[in-house]
Structure formats: structure tokens, C-alpha cells
Amino acid sequence: MRSVQIFLSQCRLLLLLVPTMLLKSLGEDVIFHPEGEFDSYEVTIPEKLSFRGEVQGVVSPVSYLLQLKGKKHVLHLWPKRLLLPRHLRVFSFTEHGELLEDHPYIPKDCNYMGSVKESLDSKATISTCMGGLRGVFNIDAKHYQIEPLKASPSFEHVVYLLKKEQFGNQVCGLSDDEIEWQMAPYENKARLRDFPGSYKHPKYLELILLFDQSRYRFVNNNLSQVIHDAILLTGIMDTYFQDVRMRIHLKALEVWTDFNKIRVGYPELAEVLGRFVIYKKSVLNARLSSDWAHLYLQRKYNDALAWSFGKVCSLEYAGSVSTLLDTNILAPATWSAHELGHAVGMSHDEQYCQCRGRLNCIMGSGRTGFSNCSYISFFKHISSGATCLNNIPGLGYVLKRCGNKIVEDNEECDCGSTEECQKDRCCQSNCKLQPGANCSIGLCCHDCRFRPSGYVCRQEGNECDLAEYCDGNSSSCPNDVYKQDGTPCKYEGRCFRKGCRSRYMQCQSIFGPDAMEAPSECYDAVNLIGDQFGNCEITGIRNFKKCESANSICGRLQCINVETIPDLPEHTTIISTHLQAENLMCWGTGYHLSMKPMGIPDLGMINDGTSCGEGRVCFKKNCVNSSVLQFDCLPEKCNTRGVCNNRKNCHCMYGWAPPFCEEVGYGGSIDSGPPGLLRGAIPSSIWVVSIIMFRLILLILSVVFVFFRQVIGNHLKPKQEKMPLSKAKTEQEESKTKTVQEESKTKTGQEESEAKTGQEESKAKTGQEESKANIESKRPKAKSVKKQKK
């Protein structure tokens, strides 16, 4: 075993190792490795130095005092800019292979570069994102790696002295002939007169780092450790490339936490590189764009420690791979920088190439920096194009937080610049809400006020989606939820990842409303061939995997009853296959890998979750049992009055309330926010309850009305004095006698009245007779008149 120099007393070392071993037994990630890639180590306590004129709360350079081998060294550091985005995207996978995306919290301004005072050509790259100092630095020709000692309560750190490493020719697998062949397409485009313009403006490279499953296991499945390793690796590469005025920006990170996405068990790293560039182009580029991608592998190979292929800004196959074997960070970062140098046009150094007067440069066999030859190659390449390096990444760190249109820390809002804030009715330029305002942005914010409870802030997109509602107390809309995978939908389909998967619907979406799904004969005739029109997997530019007979129905979509050729995206090919025996015309589309970088979607591949038989679905181009969807929402769970969402909670129908749709309510789930009363849609349950309550209220009101009527009636009657019973009886008899007398009197009066009336009638009759007699007496007698004439 190699001897180790220890700069501690034996007692102190014993006290240091005991808690370290104890914590290790408890599962802590204690970084304490005296062997491996290090010559020696010692423990020190960095002392932060303060200077006059420092402004509290403003990011400024920092300095630490380190004592190594009995000598004091001052480490000056200043913050790195543009190293990370505001929200770093981290992709990982569940044990079932489902893709996850996270945006972990990373402290602001925790990455630094610097140098050691009074040390020749010293450089340092330090990260404080995990607490303590972690990184690399050199004092003269010696390189060190510093790590915080987690077992220490007094800010102790372990400083490792790295080996004097000469990588040799085994580092990079690229030969000079291969480099010349890869550079050939760019040579004729370069123009020497473009060098000054290219040098004047800095370049920016957006990088994606990937880590295989072995590396994830090496750090005890600690995803946070992998993230901070990636940040430090990128920081070291960025420090190297600042010499040529190019910045490295870590755009995203992918960790294969479940299994490796490509085969990595080849004896040579070059074969892994071939698989990786296919994965990058066919899978990674579809998820997010970048200028370059690099894969780290926890494995040794026979041919080299690192490989690369292609150039930045190329839509063709490009990428790099390297090994990451232990806790030594500087060596893998240097190998990555070497391969990234090839990606930006740098060749291997010749014997006459120098960096700071030395021969061990990055593009040779050392780690001092880039040589003068690398400078020339780099500027020659960027003069030939490489326009993607001109894009400035989004600023990840800004000193002035208020005004960047991002609500953060204690800000209530952020309307941007002063001019923009003058037009904002809700937010002030000091990132405070206007007086009387509740909010400024959000799906549940309108005219500076919260939307009322029950307002639909996100409509359902289809029958497999679910709506979300404002709660009246926040400007944010609840997270998007949808029906659980496996929920039945129309045309005998199933919901899967927020969409109804059905061959019938997929045929109509491509070939029009008259199209129908084809029978199994079409799938067998096409998908068992294994070309761009019929396959179960695209494995390369011109390589296709034919389907097995049992899985042919999960390959490329086949339709019938196609009347017209549809208008599809450019470069999409339609193919028809005639089956003479069945007299069928089968229709489908073709697809190949070169269409992926152009952003052309593959419309003709059967969607995962599509039914392929009774109790079976297509999943990853195989016809498998539908249990893979993990659908476990029985109707009884929601009392047959709702469905389960993707969080396995009941989303109730209108008229019933969550969580289990047992009580009367307005529907929704505990995840959707509270729905409101629908206009013109009152469910029967509410009608029944309303009628019962109305009748009950009427009954109560009737009883109350009768009661008060009787009370009021009794109250309005005149009061009567009480008297003795005998007196009351006498008065009652007198009253009775009086009543009889009155009745007799009344009867007598009636008889008198009748007699009087009779007399009057008799008198009137006599008068009429007398009047008649008088009239008759006055008439002349005719007989006497006749006698006088004679």
C-alpha cells in the first residue's frame, strides 16, 4: 500500500476517524478517501477573511486563509456568472421508468473561481452550494482538491494533494486522422479576416450532462450528490474555457436512476459513444435543445477514457462520453474539457504547442490550460459558423432581484422596469402590490383581485382531462390533474397521460372523419417487415426493428376507408398497402430519425395506452397486460359518483362533494380546488333536498302563524270583570227574559206593521176606485146629446 503523509497527531487522527466511521455506518455521505487518485491529504479549517468597505447583502469577492503543510495561503474567490440557469432542470426516472423532472433548490451565488495569492499561474474553482468549500485549486505546479468534512462540527475540511498525472495518449480515443476527417466540412468555410470579429465577442455553450446508473449507485443513490458533482464539473470546464473567451452554461442534467438508457457494457468506449449520439438525437433532443451533451460512465474501457464525435451547432449526430471512476473531480473535468475542445474545433496539440510556457496542455496530455495551437483552431472554427455559440443563456444570477419579472424572496410582485411598472395597475416598482390590490399575476388573478371561489381557471382539454378551480384566496391555479391512466373513454379507448387512446380516433386525426381502424391483417402485413413504414422501433438512421407477431398491432398505425390524402407536415410520407386476398387497402405513414431534429412529430406510431385486445394495452411497442397502467379506481371508491384522478383521489360529479362523493356538493376533488354552482344546472339531489327543506319551512311558518294569530286575537278582546256565580246566573236569566220580551215586541211590531201595511193597501185601493168614479162622472153622456139635436 502506498504510504500516506499525515500532518496530524495520532490522537487527533483517531478522534477524527472514529466519528467518520460511525457516520459512515449510519449511511452518511462522508467524503474521506485517503487512497485512490490522491498522493496525500491533510485537515485544515478555512478562515474567512473580511475587508473594509464590504456591503452587507451584496455579492462580492471572498477570501479564505488556508494552512497547508505549515504554510498559510490566501485563496481569493469571486462569483461565477452564467454557470447555471435560474431553475436547473434535473431529469430522473422512477423504478418503473417514468420520467421525472425536478428543479432543485440551489443557493444563489455559490459558485466561484479565483486563485491563490502569490502563486504562479494559480487557478481555483470552488462551490459552496452544499455548505463548506468543495472544489480544486493549484499552488504553483501542485493541484489540490478540497472537501468539507461532514463529521466535523468546527468547519474542518480535507485537502487532497492530487497525483502528478500525465494522461498519455489513452485519454482521447480520437486519432489525428479522425479529427481531420471530422473537421473537413468546416475547413473551407473559415476566413482569416473573420478572426478579429470572432475574438471580440465572447461565446456561450449550453451543456447537458448525463450520468449512468453505476455513478448514481456509487454515491449511494444520492441524487443531490450527483447534481453537485455536475455543477462542480461544469464549473471547472468553465474556468478552462474562459481562457478562450467562451463560457460553459449547464442547461440541464439527466441521471439514469432506474437503468441505463443505452447499452454501456461494450469493451470499448467508442461503441458506447455510437449508441449515445443516437440516444441524444432521437430522445434527448426531442425533450430539450442544447449545444452539446456529455455522458459520464462509472466503468473502465479498453480503448480510452474519453471519446467525442461531431461538432457543436450540428443537427447531425454529435456528443461525447468519458469515465468518472472515483471522487477525483479534476481529472474527469479535464477529460471532458478535452472532448469539448474537439467539439469546438480544437485538434490535438503538436510538440511545439505551449500553454503558459509549458507543454502539458489540455489538448495534449496535461491540465494546465489551452495552448496557443488550441486558440488558433478554436477561432478558426467559430469563424466558419457555430452561430449557436452566440446565444447568451438566460441570466441565472442577478444582483438586483427586484425588476427581473420573477417573484422571489419577499417580493409580492415584480413588474419589471420602471417604465413597465408605470403601466401596471397592480404592482409597484418596489415589487410591492398597489394599495388595495390582492395580486398582480396568476390564472386566479383578475384586475388585481382574486378570482372568486369556484371560477374555472383551467378548462378540461378533453374527456380524459379534469378542470381546476380558484379557491378565492390565491392567485394561483391548482396543479393540473387528469383522469387516472386506464380510465375508460369513448370508442372503447383508455385514458393515458391526459389523452384518450383509441385507434379509431387516431385514424380520424390523420386521415379524416371517414377513416376507420384497420383489421389485424393490415398490421401483420406491414409491421412484420421492419422498415420506416412498418416497425416496432427505430434503432438507427436506416435501422428498424420489425415487430413480433404478437406485437404487430402496437407498431405503426394502419387505417382503412381513406377517401382523400390528408394535408400532413412537410416530409411526411403516406403509404398504402393492398391486400388482395382480403380486398383491403391499408393506409399508414412513414418516419425516420432525420425527421426528429426538424421537429416533425411521428403521427403514425401507435400511442402507448391504446387497447390491443381484451384486458391488454400497447406499452413501449409491446402488447402487454393492462395492469401496467396501474388502474385501481373501482366505482365503489367514489360511490359510483365520480372518477379517480392521476393522484388516485376521487373527482366527483356535479352534485356530490369530495373526498368520496358521499355528501351533497358541487363536485371536484381535493386537488382541483372548490367548484362553484353551475348556471342552469341544478342536480336532482339538490332539487330533492331543496323541496324537502321548502316544505319543512312552510310547515314551521304555518304553525307559527296559527299560534301568533290566536295570541293576538285573545289580546285584542275587551277585558270582562269576574262576578259571583249567583249574580251571573241572575243576569243570565234577566238577559234571557229581556231577549224574550224583545223577540215578542219584535213580533208584535211586525204584526202591527203588517196590519198597517194592509190598511194602507186598502186605503190605496179605495182611493183608486174614487178617482175612477170621478173621472167617469165628468164624461158627457151621449144619450142626452142626441135628444137635444132632435
Curated annotation (Swiss-Prot):
Residues 629-663 form the EGF-like domain. Residues 732-776 are annotated as: 5 X 9 AA approximate repeats. It is a single-pass type I membrane protein. Pfam families: ADAM_CR, Disintegrin, Pep_M12B_propep, Reprolysin. Plays a role in lysosomal amyloid precursor protein (APP) processing by cleaving and activating CTSD/cathepsin D which leads to APP degradation. Interacts with CTSD; this leads to activation of CTSD. This is Disintegrin and metalloproteinase domain-containing protein 30. It comes from Homo sapiens (Human). The lineage of its organism: Eukaryota, Metazoa, Chordata, Craniata, Vertebrata. The gene is ADAM30.
